[in-house]
From Swiss-Prot:
Coiled coil: none
Alphabetically ordered keywords of this record: Amino-acid biosynthesis, Aminotransferase, Histidine biosynthesis, Pyridoxal phosphate, Transferase
Family affiliation: Belongs to the class-II pyridoxal-phosphate-dependent aminotransferase family. Histidinol-phosphate aminotransferase subfamily.
Record's protein name: Histidinol-phosphate aminotransferase
Cofactor: pyridoxal 5'-phosphate
Gene that encodes it: hisC
EC number: 2.6.1.9
The organism's place on the tree of life at top rank: Bacteria
Catalysed reaction, written as an equation: L-histidinol phosphate + 2-oxoglutarate = 3-(imidazol-4-yl)-2-oxopropyl phosphate + L-glutamate
Amino acid sequence: MSKPISQIEPLPHIAATKPYVPGGKLHGAKGAVAMLASNENPFGPSPKAVEAAKAAAANVHVYPDPDYGPLRAAIAAAKGIADASRVVTSAGSDEIIHLLTQCYAGPGDEVLFTEHAFSMYRVSAGAHGATSVTVPETDMTAGVNAILGAVSPRTKILFLANPNNPTGTMLSVDELKALQDALPPHVLFVVDGAYSEYLGPDYEAQLRDLVDRRDNTVMMRTFSKIYGLAAMRLGWAYMPAGIAAIYQRIRGPFNVSSIAAAAGIACVGDEAFLKMSRDHNTHWRAIMTDALNAMGLPTPPSHANFIVTEFGSDERAAAANQHLKDNDILVRAIGGYGLPTKLRISVGSADDNQRFLDALKAFTASR
């Protein structure tokens, strides 16, 4: 007997939502793979985080603290935040994107983001029935006026990654303030600071202070990048008290594992580890940018832990990507972000960075 056709259908806006496409894997590698596709910290996590996670593993039979008070207090202390109750935690910053969208946007509403923005903004908007509106970019950056010109009475959320992924571009703090001041009060302004630690403590403090200027602004952060806890799935945000209260209503009661919370507490204030990671990134990002430009591959300045380089055509970018794979080097093709002639390359270890440069030099010499 044939199996009956299922009559269970997803909601139309769910069926229409295109899923997030992560960085690829390298199958059939001949040796050690240079992982330069996902913007991970080449040093791994802070040793303090590793030790804390090991200790916490002995108690995984006990539910986590549902309030995450120690984690929120540690984040607030490390980031100069006076009121830890305005810090919220999450299973990666993706969860913050989803929960804020669930709280503030739905069918008939618009969620605004820039043309080459992190694709989870679009996924979350679609998952909650909202309409995605993209702001065109010039030289991989959307200016304040362009963003404001896309705002409508239906706009409920503006997501702005600063620095942006995958382009590495950013608006200045003065531009962020101008944008914040000009936004209508009904628009939630979410600044995604996933890569802000790479700009240093002064910029982090400026983002924090941006939240305190208006009651419609949220700063979102992650432990996946400079802190090296990508597999832990740990994020946080700083927001006005009223928005935090709404967020906490629908956050899962145990959304962060006790192991992730312990690791976060241990590493969020590890300034020596952060400085080492930031200095390494700044040093090698400059070397890689200069080397690629010298090869005739236009590579603009980046403010994150990756660079984006131009190959002139879709075909040449694909050929370069395949050449790197053939040499056990994994980078990120970003055609899905509307940038098919470019590749995004994470700043990795010194050895992996040099392997990448040597392989690409061989490619450009032959093509």
